[in-house]
Every structure is written in structure tokens, then in C-alpha cells.
């Protein structure tokens, strides 16, 4: 998932805050403290940043693909 560019509810631009938000959380701050430091005070914007997860780090652990048994391949000739 791409980081949010705008708040899903009010439309406030948030994309420029995403890298700093991740840095602050990685440095040990809670997401709430990081959002306070960034000046994100609307609860809709806080929710948009807080619940946005980049799933690529999790998905990269798994093998992606579809296994089709050989007998099924014969059906498609």
C-alpha cells in the first residue's frame, strides 16, 4: 500500500508528513506522540496516518504464485 497523500475524510495533504512520522515511530515514540509533534490534530488525519501500513514488508516474506496441478493444465490444452 502506498502511503497516504491526503486524508481520506477531510482531504488535508498528509504525504509530506509520512516519512517523518515513520522516523519518529521507529525512533521509539508512540504514534500519538509522533502525530502530536507533527502537528496533526484532526482525528480524521490522525486515523489516516496511524492506520496506514506499508504491507510490502510483510508480503515480501511469502512466496507469491498460484500452483496449478498438472491434471488441471491438461484441461486448458
Swiss-Prot record:
Which keywords belong to this entry? Cytoplasm, DNA-directed RNA polymerase, Metal-binding, Nucleotidyltransferase, Transcription, Transferase, Zinc
Domain of life, source organism: Archaea
Q: Where in the cell is it found?
A: Cytoplasm
Q: Name one Pfam family in it.
A: RNA_pol_N
The record's cofactor note says: Binds 1 zinc ion.
Which residues take part in binding Zn(2+)? 7, 10, 44-45
The chain's disulfide connectivity reads none
* Keyword Metal-binding (UniProt): yes
Instruction: Report the protein's function.
Output: DNA-dependent RNA polymerase (RNAP) catalyzes the transcription of DNA into RNA using the four ribonucleoside triphosphates as substrates.
Cite the NCBIfam families for this sequence: PRK04016.1
Family the UniProt entry places it in: Belongs to the archaeal Rpo10/eukaryotic RPB10 RNA polymerase subunit family.
UniProt-recorded name of the protein: DNA-directed RNA polymerase subunit Rpo10
Its source organism is: Aeropyrum pernix (strain ATCC 700893 / DSM 11879 / JCM 9820 / NBRC 100138 / K1)
Amino acid at each position: 500500500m502506498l502511503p497516504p497523500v491526503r486524508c481520506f475524510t477531510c482531504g488535508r495533504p498528509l504525504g509530506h508528513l509520512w516519512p517523518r512520522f515513520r522516523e519518529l515511530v521507529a525512533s521509539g515514540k508512540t504514534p500519538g506522540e509522533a502525530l502530536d509533534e507533527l502537528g496533526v490534530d484532526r482525528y480524521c488525519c490522525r486515523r489516516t496516518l496511524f492506520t496506514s501500513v506499508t504491507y510490502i514488508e510483510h508480503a515480501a516474506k511469502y512466496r507469491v504464485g498460484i500452483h496449478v496441478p498438472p491434471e488441471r493444465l491438461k484441461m486448458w490444452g
